[in-house]
Structures are given as structure tokens and as C-alpha cells.
């Protein structure tokens, strides 16, 4: 396991490859800085991990338990806490800062965030169902079709694709390429689109490769 970083989506832009001149669509992420708020060891917690905090806020935005937890290490009030499992946490100390420079251009990362909510959506928008004929006497324009058999089973199976809430769910986009890192301003430029709208909280971790 490896340490990731929490960040905020700022928006999308494009940069140009210096060799080919091609435009590369990128998402700009404000990555950190995060503060190490807890170091977990097998002796005290049964496993190895570190907890990091991100986004300083006023104390009234946190619960008393959260404020007490952070005051143990004299950390400022941090809105978001995230834990990363590690094989060895000895290199981290309470209060250490984790910044954007933990990544380098060319690294592959997984980005998790909450997708944009689109409210109650129908079958075509939510599941890309094919619509019916709009002419020739058809009355089946945007209907779903069959939802199952009759008396047996006598119900709609769970998981049946139907109209409902679309978006506003946790989404992970895997194997995105880090194009550029601005360590002075803690900015990471990631190739392609990532979940959410500007201001969305993101979790950026080194990409997980199956079998490794």
C-alpha cells in the first residue's frame, strides 16, 4: 500500500505537448497540503496506517470528538480525515506535511470523488436505453419495456435498471496519467476528466495494478 493525498477539483483546461504540439485535456487539482494526524502501528492498533487531515476550517464546523482528536497533536481544525494503509509507517511523524510532490509527471493514479448529481432521471439518460419510434403510430417513445415476467417470479428483481436518482455517487477513475506537478502551489494536472464539479473533494492514490 502507498500513501495518497486529498485534494479539491479546480476545473479543466488544456496544455500543449512540447514535442508533438498536441493539446492535452487536463484537470487541475489542488492537492493538499495534508497533515499527518495519527500514526497507527500493529502494537497499538493491530495494523499499520497513517491518518491525514485536509482543509482547515473553523472549530464550530467540527464535532467535539474531532476537535479533541486533533488537539492531541496541536493540529488545526481539519475538515476531512482519511486513512491510508501502509506496510511501514516509521517514516511518518505526527504533524508531517504531505504535499503534491509525492507524485511525479508520468505517474499513474486512481482518482475518487463524488460525481455530479443530476436528480431524478429517466431510462434513456440514466442507462442509455434505446427509445422507441417517434412516428408511425408508435406510443412507446421513452418507455422502459418489460420489467420482468408475470406471476413467476411475481416481482421485479433487485438491480433492475429503472428510472431514479442519477449521479451524486462515489466514483473512481483508474489509471489516469499525471501530466504536471506544481510543487510550489500544490497543484497536480491529471490527464482527462475526473468525477465531480469544481470544489469536489478528491482522493488521489497511486494506481492499483491487478496482480501486483
Curated annotation (Swiss-Prot):
Keywords: Ribonucleoprotein, Ribosomal protein, RNA-binding, rRNA-binding
Gene Ontology CC entries for this record: cytosolic large ribosomal subunit
Subunit-structure text: Part of the 50S ribosomal subunit. Forms a cluster with proteins L14 and L19.
Annotated spans, Disordered: 130-155
Protein name: Large ribosomal subunit protein uL3
Signal peptide residues on this chain, from the entry's feature table: none
Coiled coil regions, renumbered to chain: none
Gene from which the chain derives: rplC
SUPFAM superfamilies the UniProt entry points to: Translation proteins (SSF50447)
General function of this protein: One of the primary rRNA binding proteins, it binds directly near the 3'-end of the 23S rRNA, where it nucleates assembly of the 50S subunit.
Any GO BP: translation
Membrane-spanning segments: none
MF terms in GO: rRNA binding; structural constituent of ribosome
Domain of life: Bacteria
Organism whose genome encodes this protein: Rippkaea orientalis (strain PCC 8801 / RF-1)
Pfam family, one: Ribosomal_L3
Classification via InterPro entries: Ribosomal_uL3 (IPR000597), Ribosomal_uL3_bac/org-type (IPR019927), Ribosomal_uL3_CS (IPR019926), Transl_B-barrel_sf (IPR009000)
Family from the record: Belongs to the universal ribosomal protein uL3 family.
Amino acid at each position: 500500500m502507498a500513501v495518497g493525498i486529498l485534494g479539491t477539483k479546480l476545473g479543466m483546461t488544456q496544455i500543449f505537448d512540447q514535442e508533438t504540439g498536441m493539446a492535452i485535456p487536463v484537470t487541475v487539482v489542488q492537492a493538499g497540503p495534508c497533515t499527518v494526524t495519527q500514526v497507527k502501528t500493529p502494537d497499538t492498533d493491530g495494523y499499520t496506517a497513517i491518518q491525514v487531515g485536509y482543509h482547515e476550517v473553523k472549530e464550530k464546523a467540527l464535532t467535539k470528538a474531532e476537535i479533541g482528536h486533533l488537539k492531541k497533536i496541536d493540529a488545526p481544525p481539519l475538515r476531512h480525515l482519511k486513512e491510508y494503509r501502509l506496510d511501514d509507517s516509521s517514516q511518518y511523524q505526527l504533524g508531517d506535511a504531505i504535499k503534491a510532490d509525492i507524485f511525479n509527471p508520468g505517474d499513474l493514479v486512481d482518482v475518487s470523488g463524488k460525481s455530479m448529481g443530476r436528480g431524478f432521471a429517466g431510462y434513456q439518460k440514466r442507462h442509455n436505453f434505446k427509445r422507441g419510434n417517434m412516428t408511425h403510430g408508435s406510443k412507446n417513445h421513452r418507455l422502459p419495456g418489460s420489467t420482468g415476467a408475470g406471476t413467476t417470479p411475481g416481482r421485479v428483481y433487485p438491480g433492475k435498471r429503472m428510472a431514479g436518482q442519477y449521479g451524486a455517487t462515489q466514483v473512481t477513475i483508474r489509471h489516469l496519467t499525471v501530466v504536471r506537478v506544481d510543487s510550489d502551489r500544490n497543484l497536480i494536472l491529471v490527464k482527462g476528466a475526473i468525477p465531480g464539479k469544481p470544489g469536489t473533494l478528491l482522493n488521489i492514490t497511486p494506481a492499483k495494478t491487478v496482480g501486483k
